[in-house]
Each structure stands twice: as structure tokens, then as C-alpha cells.
């Protein structure tokens, strides 16, 4: 970077909501496995609080020294279904409470990895963990969970899809916010620094630092300078801006990893919005020329945005990964909320948009009386998009008890608020009740 680019980056931070959304430490818990769950939980607590003891302090030091805001300090761990399977416990909530205790000790924002990978079937412990999700998430403050129900190589586990519909409904009855901390994936990635879907994959190093950047406001401001120019110019502008944003993320990641004495992993190139004014992916799409997000042309604009961000970011950092795309959560994006309230954006259009970006139907409030089979069918549709297109897709929907279409649900903090959106009233009950496995697509057979 030359001095002019450094000045521009500084201006982005001070005036355009640019920040590092998260610095996330991934920690393997494979060496914490024990047939005695009490011993295992103690090992888990000790390892997390030892390895990540300086994470918050180092993050704050980097903020102070470089003037770069770091919104969140987080930890991800090995999927707990793999760790807890060695025990004979019939309930894994104690593992979730151990993670929560560690998060509180460290002072971090979230801890992810109360997870199960069931894309091709259940292993010992998977059903137990999934059944415990409503209670585990309701009784903890900082724990995030995810379940991978499908992949391009394996197909879609429809038994798990059906079970997750039940879990989402059960969670909403205990505490609506449980579902804000639960993501159901197809093609989940092992190095995701973002929540609620982050976990530490078994192929990852023992301890690693991954970084997630932000930057919708920066992209929007850059595009305001090229009004009326061709799409070629728009794409080039996004690329150059994404380069600067990613450079900042790599700086934070490499410095943080060095000071913590661990390996640097990846920068996730995702554009992550917030509910704050000027920090919206929807507003970027509208700056490209879409009259309001959700109308015709939205999917094309989003596809170009997503691709240009990746092209610019990958030139700035030799190690990119995670989800790396444009997030389109409804509750966390002021422009999305406005479009839903105007009737321009609905769930069907959001589903189409997920085919060209990351990750999926995210932070969407739906009526509290939505049947579990309808939620399962939404999960199946998203998983199918991910499976066929060889990309990560996900569902994070929040049934709001007592709420109907048009009501507003407040989540608070970074999660913002959301209008309750309509779902199709005709349920695909017979399809969901079939269970079984949707086979992997023909183009997954590449060996």
C-alpha cells in the first residue's frame, strides 16, 4: 500500500463504518476427549481459557496502536458432537455451559462450535447434541451452534432436515433468541470466523487466528463517485475498494497471530452489514442502480458485487477462506428492513439472492405459528441450492411467538430488529416425513 491508500483506508475507518468485524481464535478440542464428561468439560475449559487468555487484550492493543476498530473477539472450537461422543451422557447441555463459562472468563463476545456434522448420516453423539440444542442455547448467553445437514459430495440428510425444523420450533418456545444463535448449513466451512455458524474444523491447526472484515459502507461511498458509469467501472471500483478492506484484515490477522504466538489462518472476505445507517449491503445494491432491493435486477447486482469483492480481496491476501461473500441478513441491514416494510422484498426473492452470494436465509423473523414442516422445507430448499451450486448456504430463521406478519421483533445489539415476514401457508409435510437422503448431484462425482 502507498501513502495515498493508507490515507484512504484511514478515512474509511473514521467516516464510512469500516471495521474488522471479528478476530476469531479457532481451538481444537480433540485432545480434550474423555469418556468421563466431567473430566472432558474441565479439559475443555482449561484449554480454551489458556489458549485464548490474551485474545481480548491483544485485540484491544491492535485497536489502540493502529486505530482499527475490532467489533468482536470470538472463539470457535471443534464440533462438540465429536468431543462428547466418547461419553455415555444422554444430554450434552453441560458441555454448552462449559463453553459459556469459558467465554465469560475470557470476556469474548461469542463462542461457536456447539455443532454437529450430519450431512450423510448420524454418528454417535449427533442426535444427542441436536436434541439438546433448544435447552443448551436457552440456558447459555454466548454459545452459538450450527448443524451441517448437506453437502455437494454427500447429498442432503432429510432426517436431519426434519429434526432441525423441530429444533427451531422447540427453541422458539423456550426463548426466541435461541434461534438467533443457531445456523443450519449445507457445505459448512471449517474456518468460518463469523457467528453463529463458526466452528473449528478437524483439518485445522491446533490453534489459529481467522479474521472477518466488514465494509458495505466503504463500497457504497466508492460507488457514489462513479454514478452513471458502466458496469465494468462499477466492478473495478468494488475490486479496488475490497483490496484495501482486505489488506486491513490481513494486517490485523498477522499481527494478532504473531502476538498470540499462534498460526494465522484466513481473512474472510464477506461484506457484513449492521443495522447502523450507511452500513448496508442493500444500499450498495441500490447504489449500483436497483431502485429498491428485492425488485428485478437485485440478483444480478448482488452476483456482481459478490464476485468483485472476491476478486479484489484475493489479490490483497494470500490466505482467504471462510464464507467470503455478501451477507444478506434482514435484521442486521437497514436497507433490507426498509425493503421488507415496503413490500419489495420477500422470502422467495431472498432465496433467489442466496444462489449468488453467502450465506442464506439469515436473521429472518417469521410468524410464531409457522409449522415445523414448513421450516424444514425452507432448510431443504436452501440446502439444495448449496448442494447443486457447490457453495455454502444456510438458514437462520426466528419464529416469533405471538407475532404475525407485519409485526416487528427486536433482537438488540448487532442483531438489530426485523419485520415478521410471510411464509407460504401450504406445508410440504408429506415430503419432509419421507426422511432419507437426497443423493449427491452427478457433478459431485469428480474422482
Swiss-Prot record:
The portions of this protein that span the membrane are: none
Q: Which Gene3D superfamilies match?
A: 3.20.70.20
Pfam families, alphabetized: DUF711
Q: InterPro entries given for it?
A: UPF0210 (IPR007841)
- Superkingdom as given in the UniProt entry: Bacteria
Query: SUPFAM superfamilies under this entry?
Result: PFL-like glycyl radical enzymes
* Family assignment from sequence similarity: Belongs to the UPF0210 family.
Question: PANTHER family attached here?
Answer: UPF0210 PROTEIN MJ1665, UPF0210 PROTEIN SPR0218
Q: How does it assemble?
A: Homodimer.
- Protein name per its UniProtKB record: UPF0210 protein Lreu_0940
